[in-house]
């Protein structure tokens, strides 16, 4: 049996996941993080994107995160996010529309603030589409 640790993924609305996992992948403020059993304690910001969860028996789950905080403790990892949405619950049409609007906004931006906001929205839309794609492959 593979080594595991306990993971909690919590959004402002609800607990999205609680259980034993083999590993997770998430994008931290300094880049991609792979958290395996026995990882050194860590507290870091996470960027908008996805968390890839490899559960106790090898099944995979993908959850979109709007950003947040990752805390790694011995035998326990916690992810706190304002928004967390399971891959199968994401609306592809809405994500595609958000991506299109963000791209239009970038093309028509008139200043750093407009561009930064549109770029952040584009990043979120692309992350949602990636979660949808990976969720389909895992099913």
Swiss-Prot record:
Membrane topology summary: Peripheral membrane protein
List the Gene3D superfamilies hit by this protein, alphabetically.
ATP synthase delta/epsilon subunit, C-terminal domain, F0F1 ATP synthase delta/epsilon subunit, N-terminal
List the molecular function annotations (GO) for this entry. Answer: ATP binding; proton-transporting ATP synthase activity, rotational mechanism
Please provide the record's keywords in A-Z order: ATP synthesis, Cell inner membrane, Cell membrane, CF(1), Hydrogen ion transport, Ion transport, Membrane, Transport
Q: What is its main location?
A: membrane
Name the cystine pairs: none
Subcellular location(s): the record lists: Cell inner membrane
Q: Does the keyword Ion transport apply?
A: yes
Q: From the record, what ranges are coiled-coil?
A: none
Q: Which domain of life is it from?
A: Bacteria
Does the record carry Oxidoreductase as a key word?
no
- Give a short account of what the protein does: Produces ATP from ADP in the presence of a proton gradient across the membrane.
Q: Which NCBIfam families match?
A: ATP_synt_epsi (TIGR01216), PRK00571.1-4 (NF001847)
Q: Which family does it belong to?
A: Belongs to the ATPase epsilon chain family.
Q: Which HAMAP family has this protein been placed in?
A: ATP_synth_epsil_bac (MF_00530)
| Assembly description | F-type ATPases have 2 components, CF(1) - the catalytic core - and CF(0) - the membrane proton channel. CF(1) has five subunits: alpha(3), beta(3), gamma(1), delta(1), epsilon(1). CF(0) has three main subunits: a, b and c.
Q: What is the name attached to this protein's record?
A: ATP synthase epsilon chain
Q: Which organism is it from?
A: Pectobacterium atrosepticum (strain SCRI 1043 / ATCC BAA-672) (Erwinia carotovora subsp. atroseptica)
């Amino acid at each position: 049996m593979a080594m595991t640790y306990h993971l909690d993924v919590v959004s402002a609305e609800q607990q999205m996941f609680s259980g034993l996992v083999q590993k997770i992948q998430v994008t931290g403020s300094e880049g991609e993080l792979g958290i395996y059993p026995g990882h050194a304690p860590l507290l870091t910001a996470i960027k908008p994107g996805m968390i890839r969860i490899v559960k106790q028996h090898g099944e995979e789950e993908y959850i979109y995160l709007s950003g947040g905080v990752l805390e790694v403790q011995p035998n326990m990892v916690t992810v706190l996010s304002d928004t967390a949405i399971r891959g199968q619950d994401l609306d592809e049409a809405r994500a595609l529309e958000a991506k299109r609007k963000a791209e239009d906004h970038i093309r028509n931006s008139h200043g750093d603030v407009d561009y930064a906001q549109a770029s952040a929205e584009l990043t979120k839309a692309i992350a949602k589409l990636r979660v949808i794609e990976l969720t389909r492959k895992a099913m």
